[in-house]
Swiss-Prot record:
Name of the protein in question: Biotin synthase
The protein's Enzyme Commission number: 2.8.1.6
Organism: Campylobacter jejuni subsp. jejuni serotype O:2 (strain ATCC 700819 / NCTC 11168)
Gene3D superfamilies per the UniProt record, alphabetical: Aldolase class I (3.20.20.70)
Entry annotated with the keyword Transferase: yes
Cofactor field: [4Fe-4S] cluster; [2Fe-2S] cluster
NCBIfam families: bioB, PRK08508.1
GO molecular function: 2 iron, 2 sulfur cluster binding; 4 iron, 4 sulfur cluster binding; biotin synthase activity; iron ion binding
Residue ranges constituting the Radical SAM core domain according to the UniProt record: 1-227
Keyword terms, alphabetized: 2Fe-2S, 4Fe-4S, Biotin biosynthesis, Iron, Iron-sulfur, Metal-binding, S-adenosyl-L-methionine, Transferase
Gene behind this protein: bioB
Upper classification of the organism: Bacteria, Pseudomonadati, Campylobacterota, Epsilonproteobacteria, Campylobacterales
Annotated residues for binding of [4Fe-4S] cluster: 16, 20, 23
Length: 278
């Protein structure tokens, strides 16, 4: 079986105006995460080279904040061009919040292949985890990305206190969008966050992967944040459950598995790594 590996770079961290209860980058909570307006282009390129060395096909440029403005758009485009020049065989993904069709077309011109904007949860549950913007605005940005001609990466976070009905509604919304890839994140509570709920069990997490693949058979199911903590020694069972991709290395504000450990284990299990997108 061939799987896709992706890595992410948090190129603008923290001080986000939004009040998402699950996020340590929100300015509404006090956390000890690193905060910076922009990462040096040389550092982004270095991380991209490391991602490629670690068999990654996708590399995501992530910025904190509600969405793109002119300054941030220019910066993301600069970063994309810098990575493309030095590491030409990576598929670039951008994750920069709300964006218009015109802004997204500019990202595509700069070399961005796919846009990631998660719905996070169901339309019904979303007001319980965020009040500073609407679920509908997130859905519209995904429509904008498709109109701009970008591949779509859209998923969310599970284990925030949502019901089974919420998960079903969420999957139905994803079916409307039919994303190329759909990330699954498992919520891990942080003492500084307003959201404090019991952690998902490994069985629940694997069921979520199975249900997502069943709902979206044509999408690449990517297991991302929380994989190592929630699934522990069972984390590689995700592929039997329908996953076709994982995020390797560190996440936005938390540590991930050492990429070399993932690669060794996956090779032992007989997996190969995608070098192009079909």
């Amino acid at each position: 079986m061939q799987i896709m590996l992706c890595a992410i770079s948090n190129i603008a961290s923290g001080n986000c105006s939004e009040d998402c209860k699950y996020c340590t980058q929100s300015a509404h909570v006090k956390t000890d995460i690193q905060k910076y307006r922009r990462k040096e282009l040389s550092q982004i390129v270095l991380e991209a080279k490391m991602a490629k060395k670690n068999e990654a096909l996708g590399f995501c440029l992530v910025t904190a904040g509600l969405g793109l403005d002119d300054e941030k758009l220019e910066y993301v485009c600069e970063a994309a061009k810098a990575v493309q020049k030095e590491v030409p065989n990576l598929l670039l993904i951008a994750c920069n919040g709300m964006a218009s069709v015109e802004q997204l077309k500019e990202l595509k011109k700069a070399g961005i292949f796919s846009y990631n904007h998660n719905l996070e949860s169901s339309k019904e549950f979303f007001p319980q985890i965020c009040t500073t913007h609407t679920w509908e605005s997130r859905f519209q940005t995904n429509l904008n990305a498709k109109e701009a001609g970008l591949m779509l990466c859209c998923g969310g976070i599970y284990g925030m206190g949502e019901s089974e009905e919420d998960r079903l509604s969420f999957r139905k919304s994803l079916q409307e969008l039919q994303p190329f890839s759909t990330p699954i994140n498992f919520f891990i509570a942080n003492e500084n966050l307003k959201l404090q709920v019991p952690r998902l069990s490994a069985d629940e997490a694997l069921k979520i992967v199975r249900d997502t693949k069943e709902a979206l058979p044509q999408s690449v199911v990517m297991v991302a944040g929380g994989r190592e903590v929630v699934l522990r020694e069972r984390q590689y069972e995700i592929f039997q459950a329908g996953a076709g991709a994982i995020v390797i290395g560190d996440y936005l504000t938390t540590k991930g598995e050492e990429p070399s450990q993932d690669i060794i284990k996956l090779k032992e299990m007989g997996f190969t790594f995608a070098s192009e997108c079909h």
